Amino acid sequence: MGSGIWVLGFFLAAVGFAVFWNSLPAPFTFDDDHAIVINEQIRHLSTSLSPTEQGSPLAGRPVVSLTFAINYALGELNVRGYRLVNIAIHVINALVLFAIAARILRVRGVAKAPELAFAIALIWMVHPLVTEPVDYVSQRTELMMATFFLATVYFGASAAARHRSDGGTRPTVSVICCALGMACKETMVVAPIIVLLYDRTFSFGSFREAVRRRGSYYAALCATWLVLVVLLWSSPRGDSAGFMGASVSPWTYLLDQSVMIVRYLRLAFWPRGLVLDYGEPAHVTFGDVAPYILAVSALLAGTIVALVRNGSVGFLGAWFFLTLAPTSSIMPISTEVGAERRMYLPLMAIVALVLAPVARAFMARTSTVAFALVAGLLSIATFQRNAEYRSGLTLWQTVLDRWPPHARAHRNLAAELKLANRRDEEIEHLRAAVNDLPELRNALGLELLALGRNAEAADELRIYVRDHPRDADAWSNLGNALDALGSRDAALDAFKRAVAVNPDNGLSQRNLALQYLQVNDFDNAVGHAREGVRLTPGDPEAHNLLGLALIGQQNVDEAIAEFQASLRLRPANNDAAGYLERTLKATRR
């Protein structure tokens, strides 16, 4: 029996690495930039555990931050290293699930418990619905939380099976894992409840007996909630976490979740049409989603009834709803109506609920063939989903193809199209996004300006500065668009507004100086060019502009000094060399 379990475990790990191996070349995506690529905090191990800035993807998640710092120390931004760690963590989670399932099935007296537990772990591990936490690198938060969640349950259950109530090392390890999980993701908050339900269902038969036997252990597990409280206080998750800064009420968000839960269940049984980003919650009413609410309510009621009867079905139903609750109702990302990564732990319960009775209903050989077929089909689907992450362009196109289009998907696809130099298509998607994300209108204006569509650019930028009159850069962009149209006076007014809004913006000062230079107002040109040099002394172009303005004032000596200063800053590829040569020739020096 012992050697057989080791063989199954080795095979499980081998399949896991094989199925996800094609994800290794995929680039970083979406929030990976903020969590990893531009995150200075993970550049050193010593700073990785420090509190992060509010709103960071790693805020309140120092253990995950530490693993990213280790990745960076070993390979800097080589994405393969980060992805390999994610795959390894996922495989470890499958192995721990295998161990937990085998223990439960043995307690229930199920024949061939290791084989059925292996099937449960295998089907879950290769299911396409778990690809997001593995392939989306910064969602290592989900993976690591699940690792410590499962370890908390495993060591707690193991101690109970060995009749160790509050002593021994296993309960201690369980509590340590629980604390570490709290430092990975907020979903860990339900782990103490799951452990208590496990003991009541599989070890002691009642809550009273469980508390009598292991009361101090449960108290220690609950004490780890303090870790989460401290982390949330020291590194707030930002306005998008919870409902403090949400654009929808908790009630509306809860209504939306009924639709999403039904979709999650559909994806569990038919995992086609996976979506990376479902967009923001819809403003729905009870009547809009009544059928979904009835379906979810029926499942919840069935779970409660099964729990009262103290059965395995009740425990698995509770596992599903409790592990889904923190990110779907209690502490959600309120700007996301749904996320497939939320199903990472809940899917385990669904797989177990389906496979256990199916295995008992059919002969062993028939079940084995069926499991192999299902696992093979799911592995192929997962392999295909991994491939979609290898291109940001493909990934964001799938979002628009498979779900009602939303602004965030249009914005991100536009960014990928820009990288691919498909600028006209980029413009189309930016236009589709600006109504819901009006802050993109400035970017739209800039892209139109870059394409020479100056009138359209000016129109978009006028709307933007009307709504954002304190944005100095936008006023400068509008000035550039108007200047390109030949509207010099209007452009001058726009540049003046930019400087008035932010006189400490060196680029705004230089833009205004250049505009004055073009209309031969050399005194004003010199004044603003000097401000540009003062604010950006290390920019050779600032010195060049001041030099040209000084030439207009006939201040040749100072102009020569500015051109020379520019050349010292950038000896090569600098227009200052030509300016200096012409000035010296003109003055016969």
Show the residue positions of the predicted features.
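Structural marker of alpha-solenoid helical repeat scaffolds
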Residues: 402, 433-436, 467, 501, ...
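Alpha-helical, heptad-rich or low-complexity scaffold/stalk segments
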Residues: 548, 552, 558-564, 568, ...
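Polytopic membrane enzymes that build or remodel cell-surface glycoconjugates and lipids
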Residues: 1-450, 473, 477, 511
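Conserved alpha-helical positions within TPR/SEL1-like repeat arrays
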Residues: 408-415, 439-450, 472-484, 507-517, ...
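Structural signature of tandem alpha-helical TPR/SEL1-like repeats
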Residues: 388-394, 419-432, 436-439, 450-463, ...
